[in-house]
Each structure stands twice: as structure tokens, then as C-alpha cells.
């Protein structure tokens, strides 16, 4: 009875844990979502600014092709920066810690926020392009570090719920940018620099508030070897002094991983004991972006117009779609511990698969069947619901759960790189797919959804309510290795690396 009471106390959501989660997610994940959508509404106004700036310098306006190219570079700088940010994750979290990396990362938000806010006054579109690269780096770091930080703060029974919170704040950021981006608010000639500059507000708040909250106890004990600090952090997070059982669990992981040290990305790819974990995050992160989520949003306005929505009202319908995304991700926070990660992934990708197939038929028939555009709208909303339940929030959560402390930073670097490269690839090639396949474009995404669903069904285990060591034992059997920490033996066979730390 006493042990059960202790488990209940250790597993509760305390005020400190809740506030740490909200500040980390609002200060970092929110910015990611905000910057995804912030340039969509004022796109034409910003291109006009580019052209006027060029005219002021040269006395002539740009041709259509260089203007389109310049805008494409502006948009693509964000995912490119995200890729760079993903590569910085390992070095930052190992040097500064999880909390320290988030605080350092605010540089890549506050500086570009000031630059973008001043770009119109300075008559420099170059400031916007550079700033988009910097906020991309910020998003690349935060999209990996926030799930890692929250996953290491949370007790095992809350790890799923808190692990979905970053994705919830990404969707909230998208919705807020869509609302602020309404033409009668900030998507106008005077307002768009303010719209872009507001991204610095969450960063400034995080910079002020996050230092008062604990660092990851796992980082403190396993990597900094400071058990006293780790115990104090756990006591603050759990709201009571008796945290010996959790400290013992972290110490057990530390003892088992001492021989492993820091596992680099190169070692990660060479280790048989991490084979299925690595392949799983590549498939899930690739499937998340290549399943067509960005293409759906790209196509949504056209679908709404074809259904008879007046052009001046499309912006409100788009914001409504963003609200659906927020609501369904909010639901995922509460059901992830009830239904589990695996079921939400299977359900989410299956809904996306069906939505892509029906949408293909609806787009092909919309000129001959009068009510087909309404089916298209249903498909868009259904896809958004499906993606918000599983494919969007779960993959980053699983990276935290299926890797141990020594390999987790490198795993996030790999997963983040796949995420951003896939994001960039879809943005680059979808217009060509659309031009070549027309209404059948979404068949490509349906196939990816199908393949990802099959992989999840056959390979990905359930991780709900399991400790990191218990999850590692599941993959030990899958990888056909003889012990829970086989990297100790494998690392002996690798050539020595002198500058690995």
C-alpha cells in the first residue's frame, strides 16, 4: 500500500512540472508553428516590398522569374535552417544541458525577430531572408530539444501526455499566426513587419522564466555525475522529498551505460543493438512529412474556392482548419496514455491514407459531379484530424522513449534531419508532382501512408507506461542481441575516436 502511494505521488502532475512544460513548449515549440504560417498571409505584400526595394536600388522592377525565385528562397530558408538546427542538437544538449540548450536557442529567435521587424524601415529584403534561416535554426533545435527535455522531466505515466504538448503548441502557433495574419489585423502594408517580429515575444518570456525551473535530472546524474543536483531537481518536480526509487532507476541506467559514453551519429548507424530503433525513427519521421501534410495545406485554399467559398472568406476557413488541428492535438494529449502510441499512429496514418484516396477521387470528379468539392473539404478536415492524432505528435515522443541517455541526442539529430529534409523535399517537388499528376497527386502520399502503416503494424512496439530500460529490453529481443546494454561489447570493436566528446 505504501509503495502504491509512493507511485501515485511520483506520477502526479505537479505545478512545477506543469509550468516547466508550458514555458518550454510556449517559448520554443510555439515559435516553430508560428513561423511556419507567419509568411503565408502577407506573401503578396512581402513580394511587393521586395520589388519596391529592388526598384529603389536599380530604378526598375524585377521580372517575374527572379521575384518568384527570391520568394522561394525566403520560404525554403526555414526548413533549411531547421536541418542545420537539427545538426546542432547533439553538441548543444551535451554542452549546455537540455534547459541550457533551449535558453541558448533563443538567440536564434530574438535576433531575427528584431531584424524582420526592422526590415521595412531598413528597406532590406535580405534581412528577411537571413532571419528566416535563423528562425529555422531555432525551430530545428527546439523541435528536438523540447520533447527530449520534457520526456526526461516527466514520470513514466505522464511521459506520453507531456510528450505531445510540444506538438500542441506548434499547432497553437500556426493558428495564432493565421489569426494575426487576417487582412484586417496584421496582413496589411503596415502590419506585416510586426506580424513577423512577434516571434521574439515567446523567446523573451522563456529567457526570463525558464532559468527558475530544473534541468533534466537524467542529464544531471548520467552526464554531469551530480547526483545531489539530480535528486534536488526530482524533488522540485515531484513535489516531495522521497525520490530515491526514481534516483535508483536513473543510477541503474547510468551504471549500465558507463561503457557506452556518448554515442555519435556515426556509431549509431554502426550499432546492431540500435538497428530497429534507428530504422523506426527514420520511417516515422519520414512518414510524418512525406505523408502529404504540407501538400494538404497547400491545396486547401484551392479546394475551398472550388467548393464555392468566396475568396475573401477563405482566410477564415483556413483559420478554422487550424483550429481543428489544435483541438485534435489537444485530444491526443489526453488519449495518448489511454490508447497508447502504437494505436494512435496506426489510427492516424490509416485516416490519412483513406482521406488521400477519397480526395484523389473527389478532385478527379469535381468538374463532373457538382457535390464533389464538398467531399474534398471533408477529406481535408479528416486528414488534419488523422495527422493531429498520431503522425504529428507521436514520432518525436518515441525518439525520447526508445533510446537511452547515451544515444538519445544523436537519435534526435538523425530524426530531426530526416524531418526537415523531408519537409524541404515536399515543398520543393510537390508543385512539380501537382503539375505532372494533377488530381492524382495525392496517390503518392496515400502510398507513403500505407507503407508507413504497415511498418508500424509489423515493427513498432507499444511503449506506454514503460520505463526506458523496459522499452530497451523489447528492442533487445528484436535486434537479437543478448543483453539490455549490448553497446558495451559493440563499442569495444569500434576503432578508438579521440575527440568524441
From Swiss-Prot:
UniProt-listed InterPro entries: Fru_transpt_5 (IPR002442), GLUT (IPR045263), MFS_dom (IPR020846), MFS_sugar_transport-like (IPR005828), MFS_trans_sf (IPR036259), Sugar/inositol_transpt (IPR003663), Sugar_transporter_CS (IPR005829)
Gene3D superfamilies the UniProt entry points to: MFS general substrate transporter like domains
Family, as annotated: Belongs to the major facilitator superfamily. Sugar transporter (TC 2.A.1.1) family. Glucose transporter subfamily.
Organism: Homo sapiens (Human)
Induction field: By forskolin in Caco-2 cells.
Positions of modified residues (N-acetylmethionine): 1
UniProt-listed Pfam families: Sugar_tr
Bilayer topology: Multi-pass membrane protein
Keyword set, alphabetical order: Acetylation, Cell membrane, Glycoprotein, Membrane, Sugar transport, Transmembrane, Transmembrane helix, Transport
Protein name per Swiss-Prot or TrEMBL: Solute carrier family 2, facilitated glucose transporter member 5
Subcellular location: Apical cell membrane; Cell membrane; Cell membrane, Sarcolemma
Function: Functions as a fructose transporter that has only low activity with other monosaccharides. Can mediate the uptake of 2-deoxyglucose, but with low efficiency. Essential for fructose uptake in the small intestine. Plays a role in the regulation of salt uptake and blood pressure in response to dietary fructose. Required for the development of high blood pressure in response to high dietary fructose intake.
Catalyzed reaction equations: D-fructose(out) = D-fructose(in)
Membrane-spanning intervals of the chain: 19-39, 69-91, 99-119, 127-149, 162-182, 193-213, 278-298, 314-334, 343-363, 372-394, 413-433, 440-460
Tissues in which the protein is found: Detected in skeletal muscle, and in jejunum brush border membrane and basolateral membrane (at protein level). Expressed in small intestine, and at much lower levels in kidney, skeletal muscle, and adipose tissue.
Broad class of where this protein is predominantly found: membrane
Binding site for D-fructose: 32, 167, 288, 296-298, 387, 419-420
Gene Ontology process terms (BP): carbohydrate metabolic process; cellular response to fructose stimulus; D-glucose import; D-glucose transmembrane transport; dehydroascorbic acid transport; fructose import across plasma membrane; fructose transmembrane transport; intestinal hexose absorption
Any one GO CC term of the record: plasma membrane
Amino acid at each position: 500500500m505504501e509503495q502504491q502511494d509512493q507511485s501515485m505521488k511520483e506520477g502526479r502532475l505537479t505545478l512545477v512540472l506543469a509550468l516547466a512544460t508550458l514555458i518550454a513548449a510556449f517559448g520554443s515549440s510555439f515559435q516553430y508553428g508560428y513561423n511556419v504560417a507567419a509568411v503565408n498571409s502577407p506573401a503578396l505584400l512581402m513580394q511587393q516590398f521586395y520589388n519596391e526595394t529592388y526598384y529603389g536600388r536599380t530604378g526598375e522592377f524585377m521580372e517575374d522569374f527572379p521575384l518568384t525565385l527570391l520568394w522561394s528562397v525566403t520560404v525554403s530558408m526555414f526548413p533549411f535552417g531547421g536541418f542545420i538546427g537539427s545538426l546542432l542538437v547533439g553538441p548543444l544538449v551535451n554542452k549546455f544541458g537540455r534547459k541550457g540548450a533551449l535558453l541558448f536557442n533563443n538567440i536564434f529567435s530574438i535576433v531575427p525577430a528584431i531584424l524582420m521587424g526592422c526590415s521595412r524601415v531598413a528597406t532590406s529584403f535580405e534581412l528577411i531572408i537571413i532571419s528566416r534561416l535563423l528562425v529555422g535554426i531555432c525551430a530545428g533545435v527546439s523541435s528536438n530539444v523540447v520533447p527530449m527535455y520534457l520526456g526526461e522531466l516527466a514520470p513514466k505515466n505522464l511521459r506520453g501526455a507531456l510528450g505531445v504538448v510540444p506538438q500542441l503548441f506548434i499547432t497553437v502557433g500556426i493558428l495564432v499566426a493565421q489569426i494575426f495574419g487576417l487582412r484586417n489585423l496584421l496582413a496589411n502594408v503596415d502590419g506585416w513587419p510586426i506580424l513577423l517580429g512577434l516571434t521574439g515575444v515567446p523567446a523573451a518570456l522563456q529567457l526570463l522564466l525558464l532559468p527558475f525551473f530544473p534541468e533534466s535530472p537524467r542529464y544531471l546524474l548520467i552526464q554531469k555525475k551530480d547526483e545531489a543536483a539530480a535528486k534536488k531537481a526530482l524533488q522540485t518536480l515531484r513535489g516531495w522529498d522521497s525520490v530515491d526509487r526514481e534516483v535508483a532507476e536513473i543510477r541503474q541506467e547510468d551504471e549500465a551505460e558507463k561503457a557506452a559514453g556518448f554515442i555519435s551519429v556515426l556509431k549509431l548507424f554502426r550499432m546492431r543493438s540500435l538497428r530497429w530503433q534507428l530504422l523506426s525513427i527514420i520511417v516515422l519521421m519520414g512518414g510524418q512529412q512525406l505523408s502529404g501534410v504540407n501538400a494538404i495545406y497547400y491545396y486547401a485554399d484551392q479546394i475551398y474556392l472550388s467548393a464555392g467559398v468566396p475568396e475573401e472568406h477563405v482566410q477564415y476557413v483556413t483559420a478554422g482548419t487550424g483550429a481543428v488541428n489544435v483541438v485534435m492535438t489537444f485530444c491526443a494529449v489526453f488519449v495518448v496514455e489511454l490508447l497508447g502510441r502504437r494505436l494512435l499512429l496506426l489510427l492516424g496514418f490509416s485516416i490519412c491514407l483513406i482521406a488521400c484516396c477519397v480526395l484523389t477521387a473527389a478532385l478527379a470528379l469535381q468538374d463532373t459531379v457538382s457535390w464533389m468539392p464538398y467531399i474534398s473539404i471533408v477529406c481535408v478536415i479528416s486528414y488534419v484530424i488523422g495527422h493531429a492524432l498520431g503522425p504529428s505528435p507521436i514520432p518525436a515522443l518515441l525518439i525520447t522513449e526508445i533510446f537511452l541517455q547515451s544515444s538519445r541526442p544523436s537519435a534526435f539529430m538523425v530524426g530531426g534531419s530526416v524531418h526537415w529534409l523531408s519537409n524541404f523535399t515536399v515543398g520543393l517537388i510537390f508543385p512539380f508532382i501537382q503539375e505532372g499528376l494533377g488530381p492524382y497527386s495525392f496517390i503518392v502520399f496515400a502510398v507513403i501512408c500505407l507503407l508507413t502503416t504497415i511498418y508500424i503494424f509489423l515493427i513498432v512496439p507499444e511503449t506506454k507506461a514503460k520505463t526506458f530500460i523496459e522499452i530497451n529490453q523489447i528492442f533487445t529481443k528484436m535486434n537479437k542481441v543478448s543483453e539490455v546494454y549490448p553497446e558495451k561489447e559493440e563499442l569495444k570493436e569500434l576503432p578508438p575516436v579521440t575527440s568524441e566528446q
